[in-house]
């Protein structure tokens, strides 16, 4: 049978939907899973920087592009509310506690604005294993009068007793990374939240290195706010992520973001889709005392919803969340730990000093090395091994596709420390 061009395109674009349905019913892929990703000559051990896009995510984005080019054979768009719900299930949150955000940093900024920083002043506690690119943000807040306290790391850890000493009465916010981008250290988030709440402080957690990589339970932790982008362990892409706000925490906070996704027409049904306010200024509009009538949407969307967002990324995120759910985070974590264990043993044998805590269960492993970038760039390039090189340390981050051959290739390429 010969297919017409339109039939062939339609069949190709329908494939992601069929694959998704089949995947839900079939056995999850075994790990390591190289088949779900494009073939490469590179031993890729840098998923903590950027996770490779899976073939399924690429097909899902291709299907979205077909719709945007008005292809009549394009499948229906991804249900965005269902994608929000999938993320909420992953981190044990309710869907209305979650909304879209451009990036992790934009989520953190939104929380700071909602709390009135810097204008209202007050005390913020953060630590030196938080995301290093957020450091200038807190330094600038300090310049503008906010009392910012830094908890220092010791041997690659932030000690709970040091957090307890820093979180004093009058603290308004504790801001941290659940899993540190520097070395994979993981906070006891529930314990930190208990310390903060005991003095009336709220807690924000950057979960970009936790969601999809280690079990996360936002409700159980008691954390007030959390945010993450999706281009790392959620296997999405740049430009869109999630912002979480615990139910009830927004009730006493002023509205600081005024975007049209946060408002809806009076009487509009619940949902996350666009609901333009009722106008009173155009011909044949109903009369009104103000230019528009609107209601505030409930939950995180009503407080943080702004304008349009990167909709082309949603199909990739949706596919990534389905993939993670099919395998299960515990299985993903266990596979990563198998790779990390072999890497840890091999690095120590070569004389490298590790700064990742020995009991960490995250998929990041960091070693200290003076002039690491200068010394390792050439041998790693020759061996076609990719990891995260910095001035005086390097970070390795295996994922679902990593196998022992990748590990052995890296260890073989590294000179003795």
Which positions does each model-derived feature cover?
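N-terminal secretory signal peptides
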Residues: 1-3
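Residues within the helices of the helix-turn-helix
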Residues: 6
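Pyridoxal 5′-phosphate
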Residues: 9-417
């Amino acid at each position: 049978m010969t297919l017409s061009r339109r039939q062939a395109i339609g069949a190709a674009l329908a494939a992601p939907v069929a694959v998704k349905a089949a995947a839900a019913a079939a056995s999850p892929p075994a790990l390591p899973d190289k088949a779900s990703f494009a073939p490469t000559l590179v031993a890729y051990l840098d998923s903590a920087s950027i996770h490779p896009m899976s073939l399924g995510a690429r097909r899902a984005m291709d299907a979205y592009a077909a719709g945007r080019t008005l292809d009549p054979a394009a499948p229906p768009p991804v249900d965005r509310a269902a994608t929000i719900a999938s993320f909420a299930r992953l981190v044990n949150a309710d869907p209305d506690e979650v909304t879209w955000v451009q990036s992790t940093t934009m989520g953190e900024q939104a929380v700071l604005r909602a709390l009135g920083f810097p204008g209202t002043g007050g005390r913020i506690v953060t630590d030196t294993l938080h995301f290093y690119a957020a450091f200038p943000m807190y330094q600038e807040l300090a310049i503008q009068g906010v009392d910012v306290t830094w908890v220092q790391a010791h041997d690659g850890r932030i000690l709970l007793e040091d957090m307890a000493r820093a979180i004093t009465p009058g603290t308004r916010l504790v801001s941290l990374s659940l899993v540190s981008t520097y070395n994979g250290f993981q906070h006891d988030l529930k314990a930190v939240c208990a310390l903060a709440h005991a003095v009336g402080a709220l807690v924000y957690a950057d979960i970009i290195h936790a969601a999809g990589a280690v079990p996360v339970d936002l409700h159980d932790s008691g954390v007030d706010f959390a945010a993450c982008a999706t281009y790392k362990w959620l296997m999405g892409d740049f430009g869109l992520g999630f912002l979480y706000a615990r139910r009830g925490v927004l009730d006493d906070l002023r509205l600081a973001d005024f975007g049209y996704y946060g408002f809806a027409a009076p009487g509009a049904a619940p949902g996350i889709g666009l609901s333009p306010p009722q106008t009173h200024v155009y011909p044949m509009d109903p009369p009104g005392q103000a230019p528009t009538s609107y209601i505030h949407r409930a939950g995180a969307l009503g407080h943080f919803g702004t304008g349009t967002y990167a909709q082309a990324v949603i199909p990739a995120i949706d596919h990534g969340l389905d993939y993670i759910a099919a395998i299960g985070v515990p299985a993903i974590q266990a596979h990563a730990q198998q790779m990390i264990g072999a890497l840890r043993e091999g690095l120590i044998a070569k004389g490298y000093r590790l700064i990742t805590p020995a009991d960490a269960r995250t998929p990041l492993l960091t070693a200290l090395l003076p002039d690491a970038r200068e010394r390792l760039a050439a041998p790693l390039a020759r061996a076609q091994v990719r990891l995260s090189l910095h001035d005086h340390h390097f970070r390795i981050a295996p994922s679902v596709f990593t196998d022992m051959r990748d590990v052995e290739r890296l260890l073989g390429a590294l000179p003795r420390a």
